[in-house]
A protein has these predicted regions:
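Catalytic machinery of carbohydrate-active enzymes
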Residues: 1-406
Length: 406
């Protein structure tokens, strides 16, 4: 389903449904004497994290997931996400039975999966954490699965972002915190009483130390190297640079111009030891093929759509640098030690910047940037993304040389 369709449904169907279900939830809770505050001695049977929109955010949520497991070691932790997130969660340590997928490509598929998920949590004591601020379908899911604790970011006196009365534990959305800190605060709120508002009245430190780290074995690394040599015997793999020229359809404005990637690639190949590998999804194969052929088909490998998620992480672990738009690979690569050069424009790196200590962000910081946020469903009226276009090839090349010691 196209992101704009999802936005329309979330707004025009989500607002009235949130209002009606919020009223129903308020009436139900007023009649109940059951407490929604848990202690470690009286923990929820199940803790559910909900994140449907961007797969890269799943990796960012890792410290929060670990915090929930630490607080309630006897509780089962589940994750509800879109179908594309399954491999990511498996590599994060979730079992297949703990991953609940929603097919967001069609309305009928989504409804079918919602019914299945509802059955999974019947008669269970559930706490639900909504990772995505002000996404109504995610907030509604907490009520749909019967969660008595429903934790998320709330608008309070802000305009927009209406969620009705769905959340029991309401946190202020702080746009000065990195997303990993916001998610961590949501997990910490599991033990907070209902009487405290707004949450969370604690300082949340940087979560870079607690980020997901994926160790790829030497055998797996060698298997991928052998595969690359077998498929491309004419190309030396002395120094590998990865280019991710794409961004999801959620915010296409995040793309650096393709002609800039072409110019950068040609300049990089002046160094004979460098091989360029282009990464991307299966849907991006054709565009990536054009890019690879335009740069230099003899020294550029189009690897888009040819890896599993684990193989992509393995590719990061054997490569020397990733140059990428603001997109999922920023976060996937942060699970390894690969140096990352991330290009940011319409969204601020303060919230979704790379969590790796080996990362550098390039941003022009125009007056109009950032123009997308959780308050506008990441939808901008921009018709000319100068925030990306004004990132020059020279700026990027200078940083690449620093990483490579040129």
């Amino acid at each position: 389903m196209h992101p704009d369709t999802m936005r329309l449904i979330d707004r025009w169907a989500g607002i009235p449904i949130c209002f009606l279900t919020g009223v129903w939830s308020w009436i139900k809770s007023a009649r109940s004497s059951k407490s929604d505050n848990y202690t470690k001695q009286d923990s929820p049977e199940i803790i559910v994290f909900i994140g449907l929109s961007e797969i890269g955010a799943l990796v960012v949520a890792y410290p929060a997931i670990q915090e929930a497991r630490k607080q309630f070691p006897n509780s089962c932790v589940y994750f509800i996400t879109a179908s594309e997130g399954a491999q990511t969660l498996e590599l994060m340590g979730f079992g297949q039975e703990e991953i609940l997928l929603i097919n967001t490509s069609s309305l009928t598929g989504m409804l079918y999966d919602l019914v299945k998920i509802r059955r999974r949590f019947n008669c269970k004591r559930v706490s639900a954490i909504v990772l995505e601020p002000f996404i109504r379908i995610s907030a509604l899911l907490t009520l749909w699965i019967g969660a008595s604790q429903r934790i998320g970011c709330y608008r309070f006196y802000n305009e927009g972002g209406f969620l009705g009365n769905l959340l029991t534990h309401r946190l202020v959305y702080n746009s000065h915190l990195h997303a990993s800190q916001t998610y961590f605060a949501l997990a910490k709120a599991l033990l907070e009483p209902l009487s405290i508002e707004p949450l969370l009245k604690e300082k949340i430190p940087s979560q870079i130390r607690n980020r997901l780290k994926i160790d790829i074995s030497a055998d797996d690394q060698q298997i991928l190297r052998n595969r690359l040599k077998l498929e491309h015997p004419e190309i030396a793999l002395q120094k590998i640079l990865l280019l991710n020229a794409n961004a999801s359809d959620i915010v296409p404005l995040r793309k650096w111009p393709m002609e800039s990637f072409v110019e950068l690639g040609k300049k990089l190949l002046k160094y004979p030891e460098i091989t360029i590998i282009i990464t991307g999804s299966e849907a991006e194969q054709q565009e990536c093929e054009v890019l690879s052929r335009t740069i230099n088909p003899d020294r550029v490998i189009n690897f888009s759509g040819k890896t599993s998620f684990k193989e992509l992480i393995t590719l990061y672990s054997i490569s020397d640098l990733l140059i990428t738009n603001d997109s999922g690979p920023v976060h996937f690569a942060s699970t390894t030690d690969i140096p990352i050069l991330a290009l940011f424009g319409p969204e601020t790196p303060k919230i979704f910047g790379p969590m790796s200590p080996n990362a550098k962000v390039i941003s022009t910081e125009l007056a109009c940037s950032p123009c997308i946020s959780v308050f506008n469903q990441k939808k901008s009226s921009c018709n000319d993304n100068q925030c990306m276009k004004q990132i020059s090839v020279k700026m990027v090349l200078n940083e690449v040389k620093k990483f490579l010691g040129k």
